[in-house]
From Swiss-Prot:
Protein name: 3-methyl-2-oxobutanoate hydroxymethyltransferase
Taxonomic placement: Bacteria, Thermotogati, Deinococcota, Deinococci, Deinococcales
Subunit (UniProt): Homodecamer; pentamer of dimers.
Subcellular localization, as worded in the UniProt entry: Cytoplasm
UniProtKB keywords: Cytoplasm, Magnesium, Metal-binding, Pantothenate biosynthesis, Transferase
Length: 273
């Protein structure tokens, strides 16, 4: 059964969140019993083949989120608001967030940053019944302005801004805050200071929950394992090997076999000659 926001807030165990981008992703995540599913704009990187999340559109997010919801009707669903959908004013942000909730069946939206403009959006959405997940630390949508995809909060300035940003998001009405790629001790400090849950990715063990990109934890893409993730399977290698075996059997005329084929009666076939 889907957990409500109060139930998530009162959880005594660490919250488990994974990403999903399609029907089977939602299906498997729900069957595994995760607490929350995030349809992240990371779909731009891991599904659509973009170099960043910037090209991902609102239509992309809605399309993929609807598929995830069909696969996971009973899991709390959070949908990223992609770049540009909450940066042009509160009215536009409200309209876009309502579209996401109405068209996908999502339970909450997520947005990055803690600028005054973003905080105003968070405040307006939360006061109007749209639950919001905040996000501080490394923010992929604007990573170029942060000096690239690298750890945040290791110096006095960025550590203080990260802490203050998380506190400001809570004050604005965010019911949960994602902490990405920050030192573990900073994440613990933020978690201790906040009354709402923190969900970490590359933020150490002391957050109230953890999130991973499913493609990372399944090993869908082969190569070096990311520092912030752990590979629990080798789905990429297994998939490649399976497709190669299929191709080999087709070329050797070993597939399909009789077991994979349909039959017909001799007299029916004879009438065709």
């Amino acid at each position: 059964m889907k957990r409500s926001i109060p139930e998530l807030l009162q959880s005594e165990q660490p919250l488990v969140m994974v990403t999903a981008y399609d029907y089977p992703g939602g299906l498997h995540a729900e069957a595994a019993g995760v607490d929350m599913i995030l349809v992240g704009d990371s779909l731009g990187n891991v599904v659509l083949g973009y170099e960043s999340t910037a090209p991902v559109t609102l239509s992309d997010m809605i399309h993929h989120s609807k598929a995830v919801r069909r696969g996971a009707p009973q899991t709390f669903l959070v949908v990223d608001m992609p770049f540009g959908t909450y940066h042009t004013g509160v009215t536009d942000a409200m309209r876009n967030a309502v579209r996401i909730i109405q068209e996908t069946g999502a339970d909450a939206v997520k947005m990055e940053g803690s600028t005054p403009e973003v905080l105003q959006v968070v405040d307006t959405l939360s006061r109007n019944g749209v639950p919001v997940v905040g996000h501080v630390g490394l923010m992929p949508q604007t990573a170029t302005a942060q000096g690239g995809l690298r750890v945040q909060g290791k110096d006095d300035d960025t550590a203080r801004r990260t802490l203050e940003g998380a506190l400001a998001l809570e004050a604005a009405g965010a019911f949960c805050v994602v902490l990405e790629a920050i030192p573990a001790r900073l994440a613990k400090l933020i978690t201790d200071r906040l009354q709402v849950p923190t969900v970490g990715i590359g933020a150490g063990i002391n957050c109230d929950g953890q999130v991973l990109v499913t493609h990372d934890l399944l090993g869908i893409y082969e190569g070096e394992e990311k520092k912030i993730a752990k590979r629990y399977a080798e789905v990429g290698r297994v998939s490649r090997e399976a497709i190669a075996r299929y191709a080999d059997e087709v070329r050797r005329r070993e597939f399909p076999t009789r077991e994979n084929s349909f039959v017909m009666k001799d007299d029916v076939l004879d009438k065709l000659y």
